[in-house]
Amino acid sequence: MLTVVYGHPYDKSFNAAIKDAILAALAKEGPEWSLIDLYADGFDPAVRAPELALYSQGRTSDALAQKYMDILSRTDKIIYIFPVWWGTEPAIVKGFHDKVLLKGFAWTYSPEGRLMPKLKIRRTVLFTTSEAPTATFSAYFTHYLPEHVFAAVGMQGAAWHNFDHIPRSTPEERAAFLKLAAREAAALIK
């Protein structure tokens, strides 16, 4: 199953347009897919003391986090859509990682103490937007996140597409990026 993780609060944003283009492409293809809309779901990204007490057991007291874990356990391809804020993912996406990618669920340790991924996600694709040039964030999104977060939990095959200079973009540039997003999503589901 393909899962889309969406992390933007404003329904008139370009991120919303990216989400809509991707969901329209997925709907045409028909196979099973799922949307995790973090803001619409009311997801709380903060890890509270009761959740932290369960963390080492790979459990959560957050019903939404558990729902997301159930979805990810059936996911073999994942698409993220979010803006780049302060050079990284928004807090709600970081909180998704903190609260959902738990030890025992998404990763564990080998008897020798090595990190062992547990998820079976073959493709991970990110669509982001930014005001600054893509090169500004390249090291984080092409190296750190794929190698130290995604690979650690079993999210493989990471690809990143960033639409930069968002305030100065033309309608033609936006339309081209939406087509790219729809094409990528359709190719993933086939």
Tell me what each language-model feature is.
Residues 27-29, 120, 154:
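Short, structurally constrained coil/turn elements
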Residues 1, 32-34, 122-124, 156-157:
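Residues at the starts of beta-strands that form the adenosine-phosphate
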Residues 1-105, 109, 168, 172-190:
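N-terminal beta1-alpha1-beta2 submodule of the flavodoxin-like/Rossmannoid cofactor-binding fold
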Residues 108-152:
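Short, glycine-/small-residue-rich phosphate/pyrophosphate-handling segment
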